[in-house]
């Protein structure tokens, strides 16, 4: 990834109250009936988020191996791509990820808020060294998802548990 500011908004919406409808196991979007979703804004000074991106890039080979030959119980393979346009940066998850030609190819799995002209479901590609995260679920446990883990650290234990209950995905933060 070749961006200076690390600004994450929109790609992970975490909410912890009843009435939510979870559309995806990794909870890219959680909506609450009748209210705006919560956004967690991560500024470039957030050292934990920088470490998360660095760890995701360092370990992307393990993700590629699992993606190419998933074991039983492994599913929902996704990568997070930074989109940059007119000085704006937005990190969005890609679903239905494939790896070919030394690139990830997938569908934008968030509703972009800052990058005009990009929309949910657009097919895009990204180089492995430019991702800001990767994740998949293995028997109900999050694998990778380093930015998700970093964000979950800011939640109270009760909110984290509620999030896990809603998404049916366990997040180990250690």
In which residue ranges do the predicted regions lie?
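Mixed-charge, low-complexity intrinsically disordered regions
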Residues: 17-93, 98-174
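Bacterial N-terminal signal peptides
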Residues: 7-15
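Bacterial N-terminal signal peptides that target proteins for export
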Residues: 1-7
């Amino acid at each position: 990834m070749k961006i200076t500011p690390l600004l994450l908004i929109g790609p992970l919406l975490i909410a912890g109250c009843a009435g939510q409808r979870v559309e995806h196991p990794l909870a890219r979007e959680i909506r609450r009936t009748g209210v705006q979703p919560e956004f967690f804004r991560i500024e470039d000074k957030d050292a934990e988020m920088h470490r998360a991106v660095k760890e995701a890039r360092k370990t992307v080979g393990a993700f590629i191996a699992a993606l190419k030959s998933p074991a039983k119980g492994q599913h929902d393979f996704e990568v997070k791509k930074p989109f940059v346009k007119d000085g704006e940066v937005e990190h969005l998850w890609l679903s239905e990820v494939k790896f070919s030609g030394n690139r990830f190819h997938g569908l934008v799995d968030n509703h972009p808020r800052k990058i005009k002209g990009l929309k949910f479901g657009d097919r895009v590609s990204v180089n492995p060294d430019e991702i800001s995260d990767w994740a998949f679920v293995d028997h109900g446990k999050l694998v990778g998802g380093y930015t998700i883990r970093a964000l979950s650290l800011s939640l109270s234990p009760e909110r984290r548990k509620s999030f896990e209950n809603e998404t049916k995905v366990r997040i180990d933060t250690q």
